[in-house]
């Protein structure tokens, strides 16, 4: 479904940040207490919390169509998703967003923050352009590429900012 993610697939047990299994027949037996409904650029994420500290998410696209159910334990190390969209595009959307959510929460204890930004690299530094979708982040990035020598595109959607021993790094993750 997401060929660009295939290098990260692993059957090995070990020191993994998280495990996300996909089972389209999965449904939770009980819905947790609603934490909130969050508008994410026109998409909606319903978030619920169970008494044991685990989380449930309903990931909907911009048309409010349900694409994915996601359940995660309290530290997001063990997660299950059901891709319920009818179209391949909806299933990809659901899986991509489930992976981003799980990564963001599972990596947070390691001083990381998944951002919605476009990043230019120049002279060994990363410059993040932040803003809502459609506000010109990628346009600004293209202007740097065209007019500022030595610039290259590091990531055009979801970079990760990480602090290691007081130094801030920007990292590029894969994107569909």
How should each PLM-predicted stretch be described?
Residues 136:
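Conserved glycine(s) of the Walker
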Residues 1-133, 143-152, 160-174:
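A noncatalytic interaction/capping subdomain that flanks phosphate/NTP-handling catalytic cores
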Residues 140:
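Hydrophobic positions on the alpha1 helix immediately C-terminal to the Walker A/P-loop
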